């Protein structure tokens, strides 16, 4: 199948906007969504990301004007090669950590390379999150859409070129991409191989967190989110369309590219964001603030302040707190924390937590800085210093995350993780304050 592999990439700026884009002049109807005859002989199609009657501020929908409607496809058949999945592991309250997963030796495209790590909901439920690590070494020739949830991609190695129905975006490590539920896309590897993390959000679409007393600016600013402009493929020839439905891959063969949207308008859009543009907030007096100040995106629940999923980062930042234990404090949390590392080192773990690795601390699992970090922090000269060349992140969720059977049985699971706290001494002396 022939396709344009090098369009000029342009983006629209903003978050939650009503965007509009057309690859041909006049392709968008004026004053209505579904005219009797759409410009250029296109078909009008609505892609809904939320229910019709949601509050307008929460509504996500986009009108597509395409060469062929999505309904033009044969029957989907279950693929013989299914993604790694199956049952979650048994109940396990232990703290878990994994070394980086290897890039596969055999040819593996983006959708073949998902390793399930943890989940807290079945795909048919309108809440919860499933977490994966992806490892790939070849570009996709087929096209994919995920009926189970919204996808948040966090590259750790290798740039991705993501061709979506609405346009093309390139995403590199230290950037993230979000693809709405049901949107068709293809991932091409610009560096030959790639590895990273995926949060599959089954709940409310991701949005910016409220800023509260921070005010009207700070954290991830809306103007730094980028949505691709319209770009279409007018191609004849066989192409496989794969959908993920209730955790399984089903496919059909089309005789055209399904990435054939010539124009579109709406708010249900793919986007990318450069984590280096995050406006980090921290203390300028004492104590380590709660990690919620590092929230980039959140998927809320019906309980105010309780997240279905938060995406939190730990970026480069200045540490200036006086008379303060500066690393993240020891903690037992109502929330469940899955952490990854994009580059550098995490300031609470001196050893063992590597880029491409991961950790899971479940509800009420005691965690905090390891023994080496703790010892250094207590004795440190509290001059201002910058934590630099680092980017850790966390998928945090209010529902218990259960590790997958594959994650519990893979050789990258560190059996000795608990030992990083084993040498924490008792320094208590009742006779010396």
UniProtKB/Swiss-Prot annotation:
Hexamer; dimer of trimers. One of its GO terms (molecular function) is homogentisate 1,2-dioxygenase activity. It comes from Pseudomonas putida (strain ATCC 700007 / DSM 6899 / JCM 31910 / BCRC 17059 / LMG 24140 / F1). Pathway: Amino-acid degradation; L-phenylalanine degradation; acetoacetate and fumarate from L-phenylalanine: step 4/6. GO terms for biological process: L-phenylalanine catabolic process; tyrosine catabolic process. Gene3D superfamilies: Jelly Rolls (2.60.120.10). Belongs to the homogentisate dioxygenase family. NCBIfam families: hmgA. It is an enzyme of class 1 (oxidoreductase). PANTHER family: HOMOGENTISATE 1,2-DIOXYGENASE. Fe cation binds at residues 331, 337, 367. It catalyses: homogentisate + O2 = 4-maleylacetoacetate + H(+). Homogentisate binds at residues 346, 367. Keywords: Dioxygenase, Iron, Metal-binding, Oxidoreductase, Phenylalanine catabolism, Tyrosine catabolism. The active site is at residue 288. This is Homogentisate 1,2-dioxygenase. Pfam families: HgmA_C (PF04209), HgmA_N (PF20510).
């Amino acid at each position: 199948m022939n396709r344009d592999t090098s369009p000029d990439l342009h983006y629209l700026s903003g978050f939650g906007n009503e965007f509009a884009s057309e690859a041909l002049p006049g392709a968008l109807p004026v004053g209505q969504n579904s005219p009797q005859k759409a410009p250029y002989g296109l078909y009008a199609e609505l892609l809904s990301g939320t229910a019709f009657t949601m509050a307008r501020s929460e509504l996500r929908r986009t009108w597509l004007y395409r060469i062929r409607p999505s309904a033009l496809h044969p029957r989907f058949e279950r693929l013989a090669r299914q993604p790694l999945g199956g049952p979650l592991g048994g109940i396990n309250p232990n703290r878990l950590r994994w070394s980086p997963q290897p890039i596969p030796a055999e040819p593996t495209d983006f959708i073949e390379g998902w390793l399930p790590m943890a989940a807290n909901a079945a795909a048919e439920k309108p809440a919860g999150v499933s977490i994966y690590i992806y490892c790939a070494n070849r570009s996709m020739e087929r096209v994919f859409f995920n009926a189970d949830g919204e996808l948040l991609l966090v590259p750790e190695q290798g740039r991705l070129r993501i061709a979506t129905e609405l346009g093309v975006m390139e995403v590199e490590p230290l950037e993230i991409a979000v693809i709405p539920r049901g949107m068709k896309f293809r991932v091409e590897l610009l560096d030959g191989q790639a590895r990273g993390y995926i949060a599959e959000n089954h709940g409310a679409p991701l949005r910016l967190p409220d800023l509260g007393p921070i005010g009207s600016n700070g954290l991830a600013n809306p103007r730094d989110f980028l949505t691709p402009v319209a770009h279409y493929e007018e191609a004849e020839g066989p192409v496989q369309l794969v959908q993920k439905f209730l955790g399984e891959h089903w496919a059909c063969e089309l005789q055209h590219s399904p990435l054939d949207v010539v124009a579109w308008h709406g708010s249900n859009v793919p986007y990318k964001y450069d984590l280096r543009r995050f406006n980090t907030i921290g203390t300028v007096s004492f104590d380590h603030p709660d990690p919620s100040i590092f929230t980039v995106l959140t998927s809320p629940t019906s309980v105010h302040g309780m997240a279905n999923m938060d995406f939190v980062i730990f970026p480069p930042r200045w540490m200036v707190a006086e008379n303060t234990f500066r690393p993240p404090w020891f903690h037992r949390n109502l929330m469940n924390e899955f952490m990854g590392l994009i580059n550098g080192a995490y300031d609470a773990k001196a050893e063992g937590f590597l880029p491409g690795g991961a950790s899971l601390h479940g509800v009420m699992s005691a965690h905090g800085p390891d023994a080496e970090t703790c010892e250094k922090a207590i004795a440190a000269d509290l001059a201002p210093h910058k934590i630099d060349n680092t980017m850790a992140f966390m998928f945090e969720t209010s529902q218990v995350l259960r590790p997958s059977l594959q994650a519990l049985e893979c050789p990258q699971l560190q059996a000795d993780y608990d030992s990083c706290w084993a040498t924490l001494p008792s320094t208590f002396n009742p006779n010396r304050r």
